[in-house]
C-alpha cells in the first residue's frame, strides 16, 4: 500500500545536542504556533536529551557521529588534528541528517531547520495566508539581536561578478527574485515530494557548502519564492562579524542595489 502523505508541516531538526536549552525553546515555539492543531510533527535527527521528554512530542531518529567517510579531502583535517581517525571519519553530517528526516516525514511540507531556529508569532498564519503554490520557500530570518541574517540571497548575479567566480554573495531586497540566488541551509521550506526527488549531497558535511550546491542544482528546476508574512529568529546569537555583516557581503549588497537602480537587475 502506498504511504498516505497528509497536508501539513514536518519540522525537520538536525541536532548534536550541544545546547538543549536553546533547542527546547525552538521546539516550544512550534507548539505555541500550532496550539490546538494536529497538522504538524517534529522530527529530530541526532543526539539530544530532549528526545527522552515525551511531552515535547519529538519523533527522534538516532544518528551517531562520526560517520565513516574516507577521503583525500580529509587529509588537511587529519594533519591539523594530528589524528588518522580524521582521515576516515567525519562529524557534521548535516546533509545526511536532513535527508533522513525527509524520508521519515508524514506531511507534504518540510521545514528544514537547525536546532537554534525558532518560529516567531504568526509564522503558521503567515504561511496559511501565503498559500501552497511553491516548491522552495523562504521568509525573513533574524539573528537573536533582531538584525537580518542570511535569508534571501544573491549568489552569482553577473551584474555583481561578471566572471561568475561565486564571490558576489549578499542579501537581496525581499521583493526581488532572480535566477542567481541560493538558499541558506540553516532554515528553508520545501515540498516533501520535491525534496525527495532532489536530495542533499551526502558527501558534503558542515562547512562544505551543501546549501550552495543544492541551491544551484534545484534553482534550475524551480523558482525560489519569498513569504513576506512569516518570520523565524535564532534563539542564540550567531556570528555577528562574518556574513552577512562583513565587508565583502556589505560591499556586494551596495553593488547589487546600485545595479538594481541602474536597471541591470530585473526581478522574475
Task: Show which residues each predicted segment covers.
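Acidic ATP/Mg2+-coordinating residue in the GHKL
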Residues: 46-47
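Cell-envelope/extracellular polymer assembly enzymes that use nucleotide-activated donors
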Residues: 7-12, 29, 41, 213
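C-terminal catalytic/acceptor-binding lobe
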Residues: 23, 176-177, 182, 204-268
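Short beta-strand-to-loop acidic/aromatic patch adjacent to the donor-nucleotide binding site
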Residues: 107-118
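Active-site-proximal specificity loops/subdomain of glycosyltransferases
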Residues: 51-104
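Active-site acidic short loop of glycosyltransferases
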Residues: 6, 105-108, 200
